[in-house]
């Protein structure tokens, strides 16, 4: 057969200009694919047969190679299959699943349902039909329930479907109390179990459930799993167990008796427990850190912008209960919880101007005390806990020698408080001084969103602090310049909401602190400037704020799984929240 090659010649009009026309048939690729599919069904020009079970599927190796890196490598790397005209998957693939994948290769269409989604995910991953695998993942994400979330966690881990794994993990964290006795729970890998029990987001109010779940999992395959026990035990919040249970476990539980590392972990928990109950100094051990579901929510507020009282919020019973009076009423302070203690830093009082004072409220013993004062008097600042230390960031201070006292420009200074020596230390300054910014910690780093600049403008930067390097850097840009916003953290996701403009006041965003990517989420139910937010039990709660002359009177809750906001309860109109913190609910004796 001869093949002629035609040279493309350029034609010119009488005026000498070029005359070129491009013809593009949009449906050409679809027509070719349809005709290839017809030839496959008629077994025309097929040069490869795939077998699954006892069924054969004639096809074209060029089509397979074009759709799948798996087949491309098989046919081009000198493997036996590149010479043979048969590939037999035996029983590793169900014939109907292979048929669906081939139909997709020749038509770009596939029907996914509850019966085949898991099989398509597995086969798509195995044969590197990545589009099919991703489509099956997306289908399973939309059909995730408490009854299947453990199985989906195992499946997504095996096939590296990161988003499905994260969604499954989140649902497992929310339903741990009903899942830990199931067959799927016993099938978890050690790393998956660690992902669950190490998370602050684990929704469990009785830590004994976690302790028993770990014992049960290890004993399901004792010979293979007993070496994992100390690592797992260290991630149980043992100091939150009743004292009698701790003592009994030390002398009666064979897994603990037989392992010196486990004995040391239990001894540490017993000492931490004793220290907490006796109010004997600061406890920073992981074994004494409560999970967020074991926290209670506290609103600090007053009948004016001058805060004078702490209120306990029971969002399940929908009650707001007065708890304690502040020793020194103040406004524009910041509050942050470390363990069972709430630290109230700085602010402005009614008489003594800008304050360096730090008041500490012990929620277990319901007592107030004073810690060492800050190095700089400040207000309009932010604070966050990081590695059991307290950081205060930015704000204003009073201008020296000016009467009446007027605020300084926004501060760059950052201070760190270590409760153990009761000492403040000046740390690396912010890249840009800010006040009225949202300050949170996530993944052992500090994040500062927006704020008011030294020039009194809104700031659009995300400032990021690495404590190991003691250095600030610019992490990302905010979707828009922000100040008077609120922030809350769920894992690696930081939720930002509110602001002081018409466009930002009701808006809410999610920032992934690992990828630095922003996602717009559902708007709040009301516009809020100077609101306050925190995360508890895999949900985000927002309280307070105002816009114009309208004061917000509801406690609202955001559910990330449904991307929806709901009002939980009303806040008394006479209560103006100044801060919102989450701390220990109770400690069993």
Swiss-Prot record:
Signal peptide: none annotated. Residues 149-250 form the BACK domain. Substrate-specific adapter of a BCR (BTB-CUL3-RBX1) E3 ubiquitin ligase complex involved in various processes, such as translation homeostasis and lipid synthesis. The BCR(KLHL25) ubiquitin ligase complex acts by mediating ubiquitination of hypophosphorylated eif4ebp1 (4E-BP1): ubiquitination and subsequent degradation of hypophosphorylated EIF4EBP1 (4E-BP1) probably serves as a homeostatic mechanism to maintain translation and prevent eIF4E inhibition when eIF4E levels are low. Coiled coil: none annotated. Component of the BCR(KLHL25) E3 ubiquitin ligase complex, at least composed of cul3, klhl25 and rbx1. Pathway: Protein modification; protein ubiquitination. Pfam families: BACK, BTB, Kelch_1, Kelch_KLHDC2_KLHL20_DRC7. GO terms for cellular component: Cul3-RING ubiquitin ligase complex; cytoplasm. Keywords: Kelch repeat, Repeat, Translation regulation, Ubl conjugation pathway. One of its GO terms (molecular function) is ubiquitin-like ligase-substrate adaptor activity. PROSITE patterns: BTB (PS50097). The keyword Manganese does not apply. This is Kelch-like protein 25. Residues 46-114 form the BTB domain. GO terms for biological process: positive regulation of CD4-positive, CD25-positive, alpha-beta regulatory T cell differentiation; positive regulation of fatty acid oxidation; proteasome-mediated ubiquitin-dependent protein catabolic process; protein ubiquitination; regulation of translational initiation; ubiquitin-dependent protein catabolic process. It comes from the Eukaryota. Kelch repeats lie at residues 296-340, 341-388, 389-444, 446-492, 494-538, 539-585.
